[in-house]
Design a protein with these regions (language model features):
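Ligand-binding pockets and gating/stacking loops
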Residues: 1-467
Length: 467
């Protein structure tokens, strides 16, 4: 069922300005507005986002539909969880044991046609704003870095790992300062022995002393620039200082060193790329990185033969027991594995359950908001190639930590999983929830380059059930 139209805060400002409230574009008025709506300490101090891009099938995972039409039925049956009456599918046996720590939101949806594809859908998820329009909107992570700053003096406040696949290309700085831009670790396969962040080590041919001499020279040159004191120039200077600290501080390399972890724990997460990505996310949160996004996409390695495109875009043979590139498959089958294989839900289930338990054991769930998201779901109806296509009418995300009540299902979709029937939420609401959990005041505007007020998640409201 489509969500009723509501007047968003952005619309309200627009109507107000049309009615003569052009005072909002006045710098003094904006300053007063910002002072009135201050940020306050929130329950969350950090955020860890697991972005499983490609459009994960909700009816095969978090929202089982055993009573749907036979021709649409998932082969994966509902199973019980640690919470009576709360069910996942049998693709989540490990995660079902930590259900009492999770809030599963089964009523996500969006109705804008522009976000029905992966690039725009991912942008929508990363920013909490419908893509398009004259002003490019920044990632939630960049906004958080701008408003809250860094808790870790030697690493960027916003890190994406590995940040080298399709979804990472949709990350946007927008109009935020350069020092809030996401730092992407890179790395083809984090499960490789001795994996390190490319470019983080200092070039031995230069050395620390020579580097500092060059940076001092750069600083002296900057002083003479006419725009030295502009916000843009200051952002660049802060970004350079941040990069210098990351290069020279030995803690930086340790933060990314997965070999610091005991073998037993690495095994618990799973020794593949996905498990080690999730583990790195926990390590970065432990280093007080403010906002971490893990964007897993299994790489082509000897461990994943033929797997060149292992995200969740299962247009062809979604239930294949190996490769989806079977006779009759289209382009979506090439390089992809079935949803029930180890490389897909098998590794997700193990890694996510291990992550939640590990963070809970270390006390990190007390003040870290963990979000498991995808940009949309998949069609209730199987297509001719026995796959499921893009679907924005209903899908699921998961939250945990930072005071999120565990063991609850939020919202509902219909018998087929096609449309939301209860407590509909959008990516705008998801963004508003993240901001509110961090203590950011949604009424305190950001400023566009021309001074206009831009509200956080302007068309969203926090998901009330997680507070």
């Amino acid at each position: 069922m489509p969500r009723p139209y509501r007047l968003g805060r952005r619309n309200f400002i627009g109507i107000g300005m049309a009615g003569g409230l052009s005072l909002l574009s006045d710098p003094e008025t904006l300053t007063a507005l910002e002072g009135q709506h201050r940020d306050r300490p929130g329950r969350a101090k950090n955020v860890l986002v697991i972005l499983e891009q490609g459009g994960m099938s909700h009816t095969d995972t978090w929202d089982p539909k055993p009573d749907t039409l036979v021709q649409q039925l998932s082969p994966y049956k509902p199973i019980s969880t640690s919470v009576p009456g709360m069910q996942f599918t049998e693709l989540l046996p490990h995660t079902s044991k930590v259900a009492h720590k999770l809030s599963v939101i089964r009523s996500m949806h969006h109705t804008t046609g522009i976000a029905n594809g992966h690039p725009k859908g991912t942008q929508y998820t990363l920013s909490g704003h419908v893509p398009g329009g004259p002003l490019e909107m920044p990632d939630i992570g960049s906004v958080v870095a701008h408003r809250m700053g860094s808790r870790c003096g030697y690493l960027s406040p916003y890190i994406m790992a590995p940040g080298n696949s399709e979804q990472a290309k949709e990350s946007r700085l927008g109009f935020m300062p350069y020092d809030t831009q996401v730092f992407k670790t890179g790395g083809r396969d984090l499960s490789e022995p001795g994996w390190k962040v490319p470019g983080l080590a200092l070039n031995k041919a230069i050395g620390e002393s020579r580097l500092k001499t060059r940076l001092n020279l750069l600083g002296n040159l900057d002083v003479g620039l006419p725009n030295h004191h502009s916000k843009k120039a200051q952002g660049w200077q802060q970004a350079i200082a941040q990069a210098e600290e990351s290069l020279l501080n030995p803690k930086s390399k340790i933060a990314f060193d997965l070999e610091q972890e005991p073998d037993q724990l690495r095994d618990a997460y799973g020794r593949g790329h996905r498990g080690q990505c999730y583990l790195l996310g926990r390590r970065l949160i432990e280093q007080d990185v403010r906002f971490v996004t893990i964007d897993v996409r299994e790489p082509l390695t000897p461990k994943t033969p033929g797997g060149t495109n292992l995200n969740w875009d299962h247009h062809d043979f979604i239930y294949a027991t190996g490769t989806c590139n079977l006779p009759g498959a289209g382009g979506g089958g090439r390089g992809r594995y079935g949803i029930g294989t180890w490389w897909m839900m098998g590794s997700v289930d193990q890694a996510f359950a291990a992550l939640i338990n590990d963070m809970d054991d270390r006390g990190l769930l007390e003040d870290t908001l963990v979000c498991f998201v995808t940009e949309f779901g998949r069609t209730p109806k199987l297509n001719k190639a026995q796959g499921r296509d893009h679907w924005t009418g209903a899908y699921s995300i998961v939250m945990a930590g930072a005071g999120v009540p565990g063991g609850q299902i939020i919202g509902a979709s219909d018998r087929q999983g096609g449309y939301v029937t209860q407590s509909a939420y959008t990516p705008d609401d998801y963004a508003a929830t993240v901001y509110r959990k961090l203590g950011l005041n949604l009424e305190k505007p950001l400023r566009a380059p021309d001074g206009r007020p831009i509200l956080l998640a302007a068309n969203g409201n926090p998901i009330r059930e997680v507070f």
